[in-house]
């Protein structure tokens, strides 16, 4: 493919004249890696085809929702039937209840749930609920964790532990983020000091239990245990952002994994998205009945949405949850993801490339580092130029990973053993070309 024949190039030029940066979400622009984004014409199973009709093995899967692969027959049938009945009503439907019941059966920490349309909306609403329920304003988040683009959560670390955060986006007033304290992920020392200084002012602590916006970094069990203990001790709410991990890493989300090692572990609030919508705009947040009844129309915490509980989106989500609930689904998905990660490790080792990787369920991450990082500062040690070489080398060979070194990857039920083998073979070819550090 040459610049004169690549149909993605004129599409991107056209897009840049119409849409800021040519995309409707920044990471899609390939700004971090350079080059031209692939414009998708269609997708099926583990693959998509771009404007040139070139096929790619897709490890983004719409950034996580497509756990069954693209165009799963049962999901398409459910969506088509729902669309025939009506696209949107702005009124309750029985399917909303069925989806709520399906989610609550899988997450014992949640007794009630509120459906919304995006992960950002769910995270923003959970923070508002935490503040309304506790009567407090301050919150803790962690470097490298992303909770959507709500103003209070677009924050980077201040100059010291006791310094509240600075906005990472223009247009966010300083007074909005002055209540947000940013700590190092996995640092029990910083966590304990923060609660000692501000514990009685904290409405909540929000965290990605497996941080997929640092590629993939796990909260250690001792760290998560201490988060739970300190929140309980000081009356702050523990909010788990499982937009990415919910029903992706295990049937009960990441919280079920921590509950195996921390007796009685449960968050106060959980934020969900991606998989629960199956590829449609749908997200949710939920918790105990006592907390959720602070929401309007029962309580004083206002939250609303024209398209919340959309009938087509709930049909898509319900069909997806039913499919992933089949016996053996997660065992097979986890095995295939592990096979990919182990294959990539072996390919890198064979070519002498520093490489580390991890996976859980259908989610994986890798680093061009000799050991897995534990926090954002360690993630930043990755050589971005080498990652860009790897990204473009794989892209040329028909393998599509995230066009940014800080994003996790996703395997679907549609990925075959042959897809995994082809990916590992392509990666080994690219590893040969990487300049040795």
Curated annotation (Swiss-Prot):
One of its GO terms (biological process) is protoporphyrinogen IX biosynthetic process. It comes from the Bacteria. Its main location: cytoplasm. It is an enzyme of class 5 (isomerase). GO terms for molecular function: glutamate-1-semialdehyde 2,1-aminomutase activity; pyridoxal phosphate binding; transaminase activity. CDD domains: OAT_like. Pathway: Porphyrin-containing compound metabolism; protoporphyrin-IX biosynthesis; 5-aminolevulinate from L-glutamyl-tRNA(Glu): step 2/2. InterPro entries: 4pyrrol_synth_GluAld_NH2Trfase (IPR004639), Aminotrans_3 (IPR005814), PyrdxlP-dep_Trfase (IPR015424), PyrdxlP-dep_Trfase_major (IPR015421), PyrdxlP-dep_Trfase_small (IPR015422). Its EC number is 5.4.3.8. It catalyses: (S)-4-amino-5-oxopentanoate = 5-aminolevulinate. Keywords: Cytoplasm, Isomerase, Porphyrin biosynthesis, Pyridoxal phosphate. The modification N6-(pyridoxal phosphate)lysine is found at residue 274. The keyword Cytoplasm applies. Homodimer. Belongs to the class-III pyridoxal-phosphate-dependent aminotransferase family. HemL subfamily. HAMAP family: HemL_aminotrans_3. This is Glutamate-1-semialdehyde 2,1-aminomutase. The gene is hemL.
């Amino acid at each position: 493919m040459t610049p004169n024949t690549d149909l993605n190039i004129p599409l991107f030029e056209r897009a840049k004249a119409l849409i800021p940066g040519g995309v409707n979400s920044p990471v899609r622009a390939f700004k971090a890696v350079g080059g031209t984004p692939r414009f998708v014409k269609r997708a099926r199973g583990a693959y998509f085809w771009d404007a040139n009709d070139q096929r790619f093995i897709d490890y983004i899967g719409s950034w996580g929702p497509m756990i069954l692969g693209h165009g799963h027959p049962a999901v398409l049938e459910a969506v088509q039937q729902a669309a025939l009945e009506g696209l949107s009503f702005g009124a309750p439907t029985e399917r909303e209840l069925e989806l709520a019941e399906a989610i609550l059966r899988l997450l014992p920490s949640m007794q009630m749930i509120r459906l919304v349309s995006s992960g950002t909306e769910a995270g923003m609403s959970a923070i508002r609920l935490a503040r309304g329920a506790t009567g407090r304003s301050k919150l803790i988040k962690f470097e490298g964790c992303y909770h959507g683009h709500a103003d209070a959560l677009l924050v980077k670390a201040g100059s010291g532990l006791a310094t509240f955060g600075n906005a990472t986006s223009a247009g966010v007033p300083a007074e909005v983020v002055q209540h947000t304290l940013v700590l190092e992920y996995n640092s029990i020392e910083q966590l304990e000091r923060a609660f000692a200084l501000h514990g009685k002012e904290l409405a909540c602590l929000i965290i990605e239990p497996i941080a997929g916006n640092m590629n993939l970094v796990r909260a250690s069990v001792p760290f998560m245990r201490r988060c739970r203990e300190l929140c309980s001790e000081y009356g702050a709410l523990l909010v788990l952002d499982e937009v990415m991990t919910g029903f992706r890493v295990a049937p009960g989300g990441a919280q079920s994994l921590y509950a195996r090692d921390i007796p009685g572990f449960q968050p106060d609030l959980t934020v969900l998205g991606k998989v629960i919508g199956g590829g449609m705009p749908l997200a949710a947040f939920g918790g105990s009945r006592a907390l959720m009844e602070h929401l309007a129309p029962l309580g004083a915490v206002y939250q609303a949405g024209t398209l919340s509980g959309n009938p087509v989106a709930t049909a898509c989500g319900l069909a997806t949850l039913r499919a992933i609930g089949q016996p053996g689904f997660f065992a097979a998905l986890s095995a295939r993801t592990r096979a990919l990660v182990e294959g990539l490790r072996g390919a890198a080792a064979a070519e002498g490339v520093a490489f580390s990787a991890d996976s859980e369920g259908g989610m994986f991450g890798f680093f061009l580092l000799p050991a897995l990082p534990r926090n954002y500062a360690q993630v930043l040690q990755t050589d971005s130029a080498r990652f860009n070489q790897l990204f473009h080398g794989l892209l040329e060979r028909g393998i599509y990973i995230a066009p940014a070194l800080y994003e996790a990857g996703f395997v679907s039920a549609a990925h075959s053993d042959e897809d995994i083998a082809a990916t590992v073979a392509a990666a080994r070819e690219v590893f040969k070309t990487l300049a040795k550090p």
